[in-house]
């Protein structure tokens, strides 16, 4: 039992820590089946093992492009361990008190303290997923530094208490590989180890995932979508299975919209592709070349003069 925690919850959803009553968050009850890529699930579960009384679990970071299934992977691992799951969605404006304990004005006019999903998992021995952790600022990360090392505690300045993690508490952080993120401080990255990279599923797994989410989708549309996604993966384009699900969903809704004047499947699918991913997605090879050129152009910029002069211009100040 964590230090300062007075027995079992004093009432449904509440615990007391050093005389302060905390309202606990609700566990996530979403279905969490994991399809394919069993090795990375085994790797995550290994991170959470404890092999000796003096050993501590690891808090890994799970990386990958948006929509590839990082959060679902963590959910499946929590389910495999038969532990309650709590998910905290990190954002650019997440504050330390959002991560830990938030004061709320109760109906009585008094201040009530609400534990975050993270703190609830800490106190109850659950699993917490810090989702999209690299969207969070350094000030918020700093409040978690002692939790992510051998101390396994956090300090709530708002409530004036120290919170110690239960021995069964487990944590991981998902991180998107895109440009719209913060750089996580090195002293935090050194605590979020190891790195588990989740890549795209293979053709069979991708088909199984789409069938799982859309069991009513016709086989020809499923095959068309999987073929598109596999081609995109081969060209290093970051279209994910989530995109495939959305393409199929919209196409199926368009097909069912007007039974008196049915749209052809190909027409509905092509329209859906454009509406979900844009017109450029109709020609993946051209899109891949454009993006490769854009990345190459970014890498070739050396100074301010590159914005105003061509590379071979004799007036270029850096030539």
Regions found by a protein language model. Name each.
Residues 52, 218, 252-256, 277-282:
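Short alpha-helix boundary/capping elements
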Residues 149-152, 195, 229-238, 296-309:
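Short flexible/disordered coil segments
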């Amino acid at each position: 039992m964590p230090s300062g925690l007075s027995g079992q919850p004093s009432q449904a959803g509440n615990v007391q820590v050093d005389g302060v009553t905390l309202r606990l968050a609700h566990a996530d009850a979403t279905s969490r089946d994991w399809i394919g890529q069993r090795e990375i699930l085994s790797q995550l579960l290994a991170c959470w093992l404890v092999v000796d009384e003096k050993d501590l679990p690891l808090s890994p970071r799970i990386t990958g492009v948006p929509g590839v299934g990082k959060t679902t992977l963590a959910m499946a691992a929590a389910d495999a361990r038969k532990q309650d799951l709590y998910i905290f969605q990190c954002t650019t404006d997440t504050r330390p008190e959002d991560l830990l304990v938030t004061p709320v004005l109760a109906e009585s006019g008094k201040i009530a303290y609400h534990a975050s999903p993270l703190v609830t998992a800490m106190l109850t021995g659950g699993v917490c997923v810090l989702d999209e952790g690299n969207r969070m600022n350094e000030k918020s990360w700093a409040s978690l530094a002692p939790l992510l090392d051998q101390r396994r505690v956090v300090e709530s300045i708002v409530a004036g208490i120290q919170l110690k993690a239960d021995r069964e508490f487990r944590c991981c952080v998902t991180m998107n590989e895109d440009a719209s993120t913060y750089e996580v401080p090195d002293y935090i990255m050194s605590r979020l180890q190891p790195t588990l990279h989740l890549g795209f599923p293979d053709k069979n797994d991708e088909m199984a995932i789409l069938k799982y989410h859309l069991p009513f989708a016709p086989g020809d549309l499923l095959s068309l979508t999987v073929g598109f996604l596999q081609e995109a993966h081969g060209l290093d384009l970051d279209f994910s299975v989530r995109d495939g699900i959305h393409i199929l969903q919209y196409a199926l809704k368009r097909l069912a919209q007007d039974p008196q004047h049915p749209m052809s499947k190909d027409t509905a699918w092509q329209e859906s592709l454009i509406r979900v991913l844009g017109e450029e997605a109709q020609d993946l090879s051209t899109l891949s070349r454009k993006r490769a050129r854009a990345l190459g152009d970014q890498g070739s910029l050396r100074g301010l003069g590159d914005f105003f002069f061509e590379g071979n211009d004799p007036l270029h100040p850096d030539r």
